[in-house]
Amino acid sequence: MKETKQEEMEVREDCESVDSNLEATVEEMESTKGTSEDLEQKLAEKTAQYEDIFSQFQRLQADFTNYKKRVEKEKGDIYLYANEKIALDLLNIIDNFERAIQSTEKTEENDSLLQGISLVYKQLLDTLTKHGVEEIEAMEKPFDMNLHYAVMQEESEGASNYVIDVLQKGYKIKDRILRPAMVKVSK
């Protein structure tokens, strides 16, 4: 019996020890649960911060890429249209050459002078063409207010709103209008 009592006491002590260990384990689990929830909350906050910063980074990267493209386009435009002002000034000289050629009478005395003027005129046109300046085709074309400047309108047997006479040639450099053509348009 003594042994049974002693075994019984050992079992009770073991039970009490298990109970106290169980309580300590439950308390530890509850504190760990609280720590785990805190960590999950911190993780969620850090994830939100990361997503916000990453989104800002992507926007900045897109803005920078667009900026680089815009600068490259502007540099290209500067190169393409660098001759625009001088070409515009030369158009008046071309007009004067055309007037000189048209008004000069064709005689033996004037023939060499006319050939010289025509040669210089052609060289000037070729140089401008080499640098992207082109004449705007207008004669017998439909009137386009972006390309033509109508100074007269006249009754005509053909279709209306067509260019029937070019009073002053128009020119463009690449896709930009230097000077619209002054035209007479049919009614």
From Swiss-Prot:
Region feature Disordered, mapped onto this chain: 1-40
Pfam families: GrpE
Keyword Cytoplasm set for record: yes
Protein name from the UniProt record: Protein GrpE
Keywords of this entry: Chaperone, Cytoplasm, Stress response
Family: Belongs to the GrpE family.
InterPro entries named among the record's database cross-references: GrpE, GrpE_coiled_coil, GrpE_head
Signal peptide (UniProt feature, chain positions): none
GO molecular function: adenyl-nucleotide exchange factor activity; protein homodimerization activity; protein-folding chaperone binding; unfolded protein binding
Role description: Participates actively in the response to hyperosmotic and heat shock by preventing the aggregation of stress-denatured proteins, in association with DnaK and GrpE. It is the nucleotide exchange factor for DnaK and may function as a thermosensor. Unfolded proteins bind initially to DnaJ; upon interaction with the DnaJ-bound protein, DnaK hydrolyzes its bound ATP, resulting in the formation of a stable complex. GrpE releases ADP from DnaK; ATP binding to DnaK triggers the release of the substrate protein, thus completing the reaction cycle.
Record-linked NCBIfam families: PRK14140.1
Location within or outside the cell: Cytoplasm
